[in-house]
Amino acid sequence: MRVLGIDPGLTRCGIGVVDGAVGAPLTMVAAGAVRTLADEELPARLLGIEKGIEQWLDDYQPDAVAVERVFAQHNVRTVMGTAQASAIAVVCAARRGLPVSLHTPSEVKAAITGSGRADKAQVGTMVARILRLDSPPRPADAADAVALAICYLWRGSAQERIARARQKFARTIELARQRHGL
């Protein structure tokens, strides 16, 4: 399975692509960032992020997308920009019918390092170890995006299978009720 991870941001939107499956070795395919200029108008920045994400989706053809869930920060302007970039990422994936999984920063940190309180350096170090790399992907936003993809492969795909099984079960029950007039 190929997963594209996205660490949303207005100035730097980290992106990483990882191939793998639960119980199998993981391989980093690519890592980088979509960048916009801080002095550009917001609509132009959002369009730039969309074009960049679409290009990554075209180039790497992922099976799923993992996006960092926006959490409340003290700086409202920062969280708004991050939320807008996150929405662009989700829309790009949804437009293609790709499964999207949102992961909190602490969930990703816990999956990668074993601690939800790990710092960026610890996450980067563990990403490099997990993927057998000489050094963490750069910039740090790309390493975070790769960590998101790993988190999806280790956790998100299982959660998705459970959700699909629940939906299938609910449909089966509904069909049985209809057949028996309940």
From Swiss-Prot:
Its cofactor is Mg(2+). It holds the Pfam family RuvC. Its EC number is 3.1.21.10. The active site is at residues 7, 68, 141. It is found in: Cytoplasm. Belongs to the RuvC family. The lineage of its organism: Bacteria, Bacillati, Actinomycetota, Actinomycetes, Streptosporangiales. It catalyses: Endonucleolytic cleavage at a junction such as a reciprocal single-stranded crossover between two homologous DNA duplexes (Holliday junction). InterPro entries: RNaseH-like_sf, RNaseH_sf, X-over_junc_endoDNase_Mg_BS, X-over_junc_endoDNase_RuvC. Keywords: Cytoplasm, DNA damage, DNA recombination, DNA repair, DNA-binding, Endonuclease, Hydrolase, Magnesium, Metal-binding, Nuclease. Mg(2+) 1 binds at residues 7, 141. It comes from Thermobifida fusca (strain YX). Mg(2+) 2 binds at residue 68. One of its GO terms (cellular component) is cytoplasm. Homodimer which binds Holliday junction (HJ) DNA. The HJ becomes 2-fold symmetrical on binding to RuvC with unstacked arms; it has a different conformation from HJ DNA in complex with RuvA. In the full resolvosome a probable DNA-RuvA(4)-RuvB(12)-RuvC(2) complex forms which resolves the HJ. The RuvA-RuvB-RuvC complex processes Holliday junction (HJ) DNA during genetic recombination and DNA repair. Endonuclease that resolves HJ intermediates. Cleaves cruciform DNA by making single-stranded nicks across the HJ at symmetrical positions within the homologous arms, yielding a 5'-phosphate and a 3'-hydroxyl group; requires a central core of homology in the junction. The consensus cleavage sequence is 5'-(A/T)TT(C/G)-3'. Cleavage occurs on the 3'-side of the TT dinucleotide at the point of strand exchange. One of its GO terms (molecular function) is crossover junction DNA endonuclease activity. This is Crossover junction endodeoxyribonuclease RuvC. It is an enzyme of class 3 (hydrolase). Binds 2 Mg(2+) ion per subunit. One of its GO terms (biological process) is DNA repair.
